[in-house]
Protein backbone atom coordinates (compact mmCIF):
# COMPACT_ATOMS: atom_id res chain seq x y z
CA UNK A 1 0.00 0.00 0.00
CA UNK A 2 1.16 3.49 -0.81
CA UNK A 3 -0.04 6.25 1.49
CA UNK A 4 0.05 9.89 0.35
CA UNK A 5 -0.16 12.55 3.06
CA UNK A 6 -0.93 15.97 1.59
CA UNK A 7 -1.03 19.32 3.32
CA UNK A 8 -3.64 21.79 2.06
CA UNK A 9 -2.71 24.51 -0.39
CA UNK A 10 -1.87 28.13 0.43
CA UNK A 11 -4.60 29.04 2.94
CA UNK A 12 -6.82 31.80 4.16
CA UNK A 13 -7.48 30.85 7.77
CA UNK A 14 -10.38 33.28 8.27
CA UNK A 15 -12.63 32.52 6.53
CA UNK A 16 -11.32 28.97 6.08
CA UNK A 17 -10.49 28.60 2.37
CA UNK A 18 -7.68 28.63 -0.20
CA UNK A 19 -6.07 31.67 -1.76
CA UNK A 20 -6.02 31.87 -5.59
CA UNK A 21 -2.45 30.58 -5.31
CA UNK A 22 -3.68 27.67 -3.21
CA UNK A 23 -6.27 26.80 -5.84
CA UNK A 24 -3.54 26.66 -8.50
CA UNK A 25 -1.47 24.45 -6.21
CA UNK A 26 -4.40 22.08 -5.73
CA UNK A 27 -4.97 21.84 -9.50
CA UNK A 28 -1.27 21.11 -10.09
CA UNK A 29 -1.32 18.45 -7.40
CA UNK A 30 -4.33 16.75 -9.00
CA UNK A 31 -2.40 16.32 -12.25
CA UNK A 32 0.51 14.78 -10.37
CA UNK A 33 -1.65 12.32 -8.44
CA UNK A 34 -3.59 11.38 -11.57
CA UNK A 35 -0.36 10.30 -13.29
CA UNK A 36 -0.40 6.90 -11.56
CA UNK A 37 -3.81 7.12 -9.94
CA UNK A 38 -5.32 7.12 -6.46
CA UNK A 39 -7.81 4.53 -5.21
CA UNK A 40 -9.26 6.32 -2.19
CA UNK A 41 -9.31 9.88 -0.90
CA UNK A 42 -9.68 10.88 2.75
CA UNK A 43 -9.85 14.49 3.85
CA UNK A 44 -10.09 16.65 6.95
CA UNK A 45 -13.42 18.40 7.47
CA UNK A 46 -11.82 21.85 7.14
CA UNK A 47 -12.71 23.84 4.03
CA UNK A 48 -9.09 24.44 2.98
CA UNK A 49 -8.36 20.71 3.00
CA UNK A 50 -11.61 19.94 1.18
CA UNK A 51 -10.81 22.53 -1.49
CA UNK A 52 -7.33 21.07 -1.93
CA UNK A 53 -8.71 17.56 -2.41
CA UNK A 54 -11.52 18.62 -4.77
CA UNK A 55 -9.52 18.84 -8.05
CA UNK A 56 -7.99 15.39 -7.49
CA UNK A 57 -11.37 13.88 -6.65
CA UNK A 58 -12.95 15.43 -9.74
CA UNK A 59 -10.14 14.40 -12.08
CA UNK A 60 -10.17 10.79 -10.84
CA UNK A 61 -13.93 10.49 -10.34
CA UNK A 62 -13.62 9.66 -6.63
CA UNK A 63 -15.83 10.59 -3.68
CA UNK A 64 -13.67 11.75 -0.74
CA UNK A 65 -14.44 10.47 2.74
CA UNK A 66 -14.33 13.16 5.42
CA UNK A 67 -12.53 12.42 8.70
CA UNK A 68 -13.54 14.88 11.42
CA UNK A 69 -10.78 13.75 13.78
CA UNK A 70 -8.16 15.15 11.38
CA UNK A 71 -9.39 18.73 11.54
CA UNK A 72 -6.77 21.23 12.66
CA UNK A 73 -8.72 22.90 15.46
CA UNK A 74 -8.69 19.71 17.55
CA UNK A 75 -4.91 19.47 17.27
CA UNK A 76 -4.59 23.17 18.08
CA UNK A 77 -6.37 22.60 21.40
CA UNK A 78 -3.80 19.97 22.34
CA UNK A 79 -0.56 21.41 20.94
CA UNK A 80 -0.89 25.20 21.03
CA UNK A 81 0.16 26.92 24.26
CA UNK A 82 1.40 30.17 25.68
CA UNK A 83 5.08 30.16 26.60
CA UNK A 84 7.68 32.62 27.92
CA UNK A 85 8.50 33.63 24.33
CA UNK A 86 4.88 33.96 23.16
CA UNK A 87 2.15 35.91 24.95
CA UNK A 88 -0.55 34.31 22.80
CA UNK A 89 -1.21 30.64 22.16
CA UNK A 90 1.21 29.32 19.56
CA UNK A 91 2.07 25.97 18.01
CA UNK A 92 4.62 24.36 20.30
CA UNK A 93 6.78 23.34 17.33
CA UNK A 94 7.14 27.04 16.43
CA UNK A 95 8.09 28.16 19.94
CA UNK A 96 11.77 28.50 20.85
CA UNK A 97 10.91 27.59 24.44
CA UNK A 98 9.25 24.29 23.55
CA UNK A 99 11.79 23.48 20.84
CA UNK A 100 14.50 23.71 23.49
CA UNK A 101 12.51 21.63 25.97
CA UNK A 102 11.51 18.99 23.40
CA UNK A 103 15.17 18.50 22.46
CA UNK A 104 16.55 18.52 25.98
CA UNK A 105 18.38 15.40 27.19
CA UNK A 106 15.67 14.82 29.78
CA UNK A 107 12.80 14.71 27.29
CA UNK A 108 14.75 12.79 24.65
CA UNK A 109 15.65 10.15 27.25
CA UNK A 110 11.96 9.49 27.92
CA UNK A 111 11.37 8.41 24.32
CA UNK A 112 7.78 7.34 23.77
CA UNK A 113 6.97 8.22 27.39
CA UNK A 114 7.83 11.89 26.90
CA UNK A 115 4.37 13.08 28.00
CA UNK A 116 5.11 11.77 31.52
CA UNK A 117 7.61 14.58 32.13
CA UNK A 118 6.44 16.57 35.19
CA UNK A 119 6.85 19.86 33.32
CA UNK A 120 4.08 18.79 30.92
CA UNK A 121 1.62 17.79 33.64
CA UNK A 122 -0.58 20.84 33.05
CA UNK A 123 -0.70 20.46 29.27
CA UNK A 124 -2.94 18.40 26.99
CA UNK A 125 0.00 16.69 25.29
CA UNK A 126 -0.81 13.23 26.67
CA UNK A 127 -4.49 13.47 25.72
CA UNK A 128 -3.65 14.83 22.28
CA UNK A 129 -1.15 12.13 21.37
CA UNK A 130 -3.40 9.40 22.78
CA UNK A 131 -6.35 10.68 20.73
CA UNK A 132 -4.43 10.89 17.47
CA UNK A 133 -2.69 7.54 18.02
CA UNK A 134 -6.04 5.84 18.70
CA UNK A 135 -7.64 7.32 15.58
CA UNK A 136 -4.55 6.61 13.48
CA UNK A 137 -4.45 2.98 14.55
CA UNK A 138 -8.16 2.54 13.85
CA UNK A 139 -7.79 4.19 10.44
CA UNK A 140 -4.98 1.93 9.26
CA UNK A 141 -6.62 -1.14 10.80
CA UNK A 142 -9.65 -0.37 8.62
CA UNK A 143 -7.30 -0.53 5.63
CA UNK A 144 -5.93 -3.90 6.77
CA UNK A 145 -2.78 -2.75 8.61
CA UNK A 146 -2.70 -3.31 12.38
CA UNK A 147 0.00 -1.62 14.45
CA UNK A 148 1.94 -3.42 17.17
CA UNK A 149 2.08 -0.85 20.01
CA UNK A 150 5.33 -2.29 21.35
CA UNK A 151 7.46 -2.34 18.19
CA UNK A 152 5.59 0.20 16.06
CA UNK A 153 5.58 -2.27 13.17
CA UNK A 154 2.40 -3.43 11.45
CA UNK A 155 0.69 -6.76 10.91
CA UNK A 156 -0.91 -7.03 7.48
CA UNK A 157 -4.34 -8.60 7.74
CA UNK A 158 -5.41 -7.69 4.21
CA UNK A 159 -2.52 -7.09 1.80
CA UNK A 160 -3.27 -4.14 -0.43
CA UNK A 161 -1.79 -2.55 -3.49
CA UNK A 162 -4.05 0.48 -3.08
CA UNK A 163 -2.88 4.07 -3.27
CA UNK A 164 -4.47 6.11 -0.49
CA UNK A 165 -4.47 9.93 -0.38
CA UNK A 166 -5.15 11.85 2.84
CA UNK A 167 -5.54 15.64 2.62
CA UNK A 168 -5.12 17.51 5.90
CA UNK A 169 -2.84 19.93 7.75
CA UNK A 170 0.57 20.87 9.08
CA UNK A 171 -0.13 20.82 12.82
CA UNK A 172 -2.23 17.68 12.66
CA UNK A 173 0.17 16.05 10.22
CA UNK A 174 3.19 16.39 12.49
CA UNK A 175 1.38 14.48 15.24
CA UNK A 176 -0.21 12.03 12.79
CA UNK A 177 3.03 11.06 11.07
CA UNK A 178 4.87 10.79 14.37
CA UNK A 179 2.26 8.18 15.33
CA UNK A 180 2.54 6.32 12.01
CA UNK A 181 6.34 6.27 12.06
CA UNK A 182 6.74 5.51 15.77
CA UNK A 183 8.89 8.62 16.20
CA UNK A 184 8.25 10.57 19.44
CA UNK A 185 6.39 13.81 18.75
CA UNK A 186 9.00 16.14 20.34
CA UNK A 187 11.63 14.91 17.90
CA UNK A 188 9.42 14.69 14.83
CA UNK A 189 7.63 18.02 15.14
CA UNK A 190 10.85 19.98 15.61
CA UNK A 191 12.80 18.34 12.77
CA UNK A 192 10.26 17.96 9.94
CA UNK A 193 7.75 20.21 8.20
CA UNK A 194 5.29 20.28 5.29
CA UNK A 195 4.97 22.89 2.54
CA UNK A 196 1.65 24.01 1.10
CA UNK A 197 0.13 21.27 -1.10
CA UNK A 198 3.20 19.11 -0.49
CA UNK A 199 3.02 15.34 -0.85
CA UNK A 200 4.61 12.87 1.56
CA UNK A 201 4.66 9.27 0.32
CA UNK A 202 4.86 6.33 2.74
CA UNK A 203 5.06 2.72 1.62
CA UNK A 204 3.51 0.06 3.83
CA UNK A 205 5.62 -2.81 2.57
CA UNK A 206 5.43 -6.29 4.03
CA UNK A 207 8.70 -8.20 4.31
CA UNK A 208 8.97 -12.00 4.12
CA UNK A 209 5.26 -12.67 3.79
CA UNK A 210 6.03 -16.24 2.74
CA UNK A 211 7.67 -16.88 6.13
CA UNK A 212 6.05 -17.58 9.47
CA UNK A 213 6.67 -14.13 10.93
CA UNK A 214 6.40 -11.40 8.27
CA UNK A 215 6.60 -7.75 9.22
CA UNK A 216 5.43 -4.47 7.73
CA UNK A 217 7.11 -1.18 8.50
CA UNK A 218 6.05 2.16 7.01
CA UNK A 219 8.91 3.76 5.09
CA UNK A 220 9.02 7.34 3.87
CA UNK A 221 9.82 7.41 0.16
CA UNK A 222 9.36 11.17 -0.26
CA UNK A 223 8.75 13.94 2.24
CA UNK A 224 7.05 17.28 1.49
CA UNK A 225 7.50 16.84 -2.27
CA UNK A 226 6.37 19.86 -4.30
CA UNK A 227 7.55 18.83 -7.78
CA UNK A 228 4.02 19.39 -9.09
CA UNK A 229 4.48 23.12 -8.49
CA UNK A 230 7.71 23.19 -10.48
CA UNK A 231 6.08 21.19 -13.28
CA UNK A 232 3.28 23.76 -13.61
CA UNK A 233 5.56 26.79 -13.31
CA UNK A 234 4.24 27.80 -9.89
CA UNK A 235 6.45 29.32 -7.18
CA UNK A 236 8.28 26.74 -5.09
CA UNK A 237 8.39 29.02 -2.07
CA UNK A 238 8.19 27.09 1.19
CA UNK A 239 5.56 28.56 3.53
CA UNK A 240 5.68 31.74 1.42
CA UNK A 241 9.01 32.32 3.12
CA UNK A 242 11.94 30.83 1.23
CA UNK A 243 12.57 29.68 -2.34
CA UNK A 244 14.41 26.44 -3.11
Which residue ranges define each predicted feature?
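Active-site-proximal alpha-helix that buttresses catalytic centers in soluble enzyme cores
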Residues: 1-71
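Beta-strand elements within well-structured catalytic alpha/beta cores of enzymes
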Residues: 2-6, 42, 159-168, 172
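Active-site metal-binding loops of divalent metal-dependent hydrolases
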Residues: 9, 170, 224-226
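Aromatic-acidic/polar surface patches that form glycan- and anion
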Residues: 18, 42-45, 125, 129, ...
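A structural signal for well-ordered alpha-helical segments within the folded catalytic domains
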Residues: 27, 47-51, 130, 134, ...
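Non-transmembrane alpha-helical segments in soluble domains
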Residues: 30, 57, 133, 137-140, ...
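Phosphate-handling substructures
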Residues: 61-145
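Acidic, low-complexity terminal tails and accessory targeting/binding regions
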Residues: 73-93, 146, 150-163, 174-244
Amino acid sequence: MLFFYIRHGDPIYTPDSLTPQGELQAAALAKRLALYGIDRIYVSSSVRAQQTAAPTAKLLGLEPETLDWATEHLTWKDFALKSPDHKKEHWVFQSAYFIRRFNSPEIRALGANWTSAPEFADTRFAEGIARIQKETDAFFASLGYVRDPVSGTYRVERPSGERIAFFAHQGFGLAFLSCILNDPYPHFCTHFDFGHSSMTVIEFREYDRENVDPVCVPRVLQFSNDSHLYREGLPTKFENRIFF
